Amino acid sequence: MDRDLLRQSLNCHGSSLLSLLRSEQQDNPHFRSLLGSAAEPARGPPPQHPLQGRKEKRVDNIEIQKFISKKADLLFALSWKSDAPATSEINEDSEDHYAIMPPLEQFMEIPSMDRRELFFRDIERGDIVIGRISSIREFGFFMVLICLGSGIMRDIAHLEITALCPLRDVPSHSNHGDPLSYYQTGDIIRAGIKDIDRYHEKLAVSLYSSSLPPHLSGIKLGVISSEELPLYYRRSVELNSNSLESYENVMQSSLGFVNPGVVEFLLEKLGIDESNPPSLMRGLQSKNFSEDDFASALRKKQSASWALKCVKIGVDYFKVGRHVDAMNEYNKALEIDKQNVEALVARGALYATKGSLNKAIEDFELALENCPTHRNARKYLCQTLVERGGQLEEEEKFLNAESYYKKALALDETFKDAEDALQKLHKYMQKSLELREKQAEKEEKQKTKKIETSAEKLRKLLKEEKRLKKKRRKSTSSSSVSSADESVSSSSSSSSSGHKRHKKHKRNRSESSRSSRRHSSRASSNQIDQNRKDECYPVPANTSASFLNHKQEVEKLLGKQDRLQYEKTQIKEKDRCPLSSSSLEIPDDFGGRSEDPRDFYNSYKTQAGSSKTEKPYKSERHFSSRRNSSDSFCRNSEDKIYGYRRFEKDIEGRKEHYRRWEPGSVRHSTSPASSEYSWKSVEKYKKYAHSGSRDFSRHEQRYRLNTNQGEYEREDNYGEDIKTEVPEEDALSSKEHSESSVKKNLPQNLLNIFNQIAEFEKEKGNKSKN
């Protein structure tokens, strides 16, 4: 109930309306509380008395008051109140949403006096007025009003109503200029009502927007053009030129009147609900009628009856087999009524027969939504779901098939086809899971077997590789022994044949001395070898590998020193006496000094692995060196035999010399033969490192003195110099000097290992003596 509107009505009509409302609306619970407060004095402004000069027509309209009292529950209801916000009328005039007409009094020929009184009665502060400047004074300017810019539309152009705009209400357009200098007489001004004197009919206006209400504050005040005048004023001017036009003709000629959305626009502007419009006629109130009596429900019934006719025609086509025509009729029925259940069920059945199960399921589900109690729709939907589940089961989409079966059971729990299909699917899924598990176990076993077989293969390959290495070692050792034997036999045969051809006086001169030395050296060497075999003990396990590695380093160090000195002597010897240089290359097969220290290192490695054997490539190198020096060998084979025998005697003499100065410590190697050979070679390198250059220089001097003598005498002198020129004191000093230099060059850990080995050998020797 709109209490403000009721209070205004009671203030206007007085106590007579109040008594009528009490008698008519006594049963209305809303009016009981309101009428009690309405009887009190009104809180609003006091009722306005008729103005002086107005004719007294105080006739109480009892019929209007009776009408208000009878329709009070409808007139003062909140549904009549406008909910639309107040908008600017100036902006709406520019758009022809509805027919905008001239003021009504222009067609009614109302006297100017009455129109003037009505204007001053209805005008309020904040209303917008439009006029022309008539005069400009120092305190402001006067303007004659021609129309209203807001509120009620009035025809005031001929009433000559003036308004004053004071200087304080005129905004300045420059900082130091006169604000009134901007305006001229005849300018059209839009201003807001600031003050009203209804008794003297005087108005004061302002050009500041602060004088306007909030909903009109956006309107521009000041000078405007004729095009900005309100639309109703322009049409009233046109009507004055042609006064014969009627109100109806003007309304129909306007563009907004023929607008198709004019009703919706006006209802929205007035705040009236279109779906539940209020009416003052009791019989037309919407609450007094049922929903089936309204147009929307009647339209649905009508469209449903038309759709059923199309469905019947489509069913007839379907029975005959004309599926295309049946589908067209079903689609036509659904165009008329989109939610027609029968049309949806019939079209779904047609889709199912064609094989489009998904479309059929959609139609059946939509039919069940519109009518949940439709039996055929439920039945057909369950059957279609089971059929679709079977298709998915064939495609091995078991989870989707299971969901379709469950949907069918949710719609109808007694549907046996869906229940049986679901049980079969569960059994099949269990079997498939078991098979997958078994297959996974088999794959795991196969993987483990593959891993085991690969490991076994690797083991076999390693064993085979070890076996092949052993075979290769045996073959290399046997080949080296055979090659050494062959080389010795070949050298002995060649030397014997060449020795026969040698001259007799040379052989008789040197044979006696050499034979005596050979026998003595052989006897002493055999005795020393026997003693070494008796005194040799195995090396401790924890020092053998490291000692061998360090021993090889020692041999490399000694070999470098010997190689530098020996290469110099070899170059000089080869340049001056090719025969002696070729004879010096022969001892490589018998453990003598070689030209390259790497040969000594290789011979040491092979002799440590297998006793009494040498590398086969030494003999090959021996024969290759012999082939390289064949130019000097082939000249005289007797010279070769003589040099070979002389070298044997040289070796035997050195053995005797080494046995005299040999220390008591035992040589450390894996076998006695290899240890003896390695010790001899090391001692030989030590000795040659200090005395080789001196011996060779002495030999070179003798070689120069005896150049005119025979070739055989030079060789004898060379052999005898090697055997006899080294005294015992020089040998001892050179040996000590070489050992001290090696010890200085060796690292501390290697020296410690040598000391431990020497102590170990001493302990073994003491135990054997005891």
From Swiss-Prot:
SMART domains: TPR (SM00028). Keywords: Isopeptide bond, Phosphoprotein, Repeat, TPR repeat, Ubl conjugation. The modification Phosphoserine is found at S671. The keyword Repeat applies. TPR repeats lie at residues 210-243, 307-340, 342-374, 382-415. Residues 626-635 have a biased composition (Polar residues). Residues 36-56, 439-458, 464-550, 569-635, 690-747 are annotated as: Disordered. Coiled coil: none annotated. It comes from Homo sapiens (Human). Belongs to the TTC14 family. Residues 126-208 form the S1 motif domain. GO terms for molecular function: nucleic acid binding. Gene3D superfamilies: Nucleic acid-binding proteins, Tetratricopeptide repeat domain. There is a cross-link at K723 (Glycyl lysine isopeptide (Lys-Gly) (interchain with G-Cter in SUMO2)). Pfam families: TPR_11 (PF13414). Residues 590-599, 612-623, 690-703, 711-742 have a biased composition (Basic and acidic residues). Residues 498-508 have a biased composition (Basic residues). This is Tetratricopeptide repeat protein 14. Residues 476-497 have a biased composition (Low complexity).
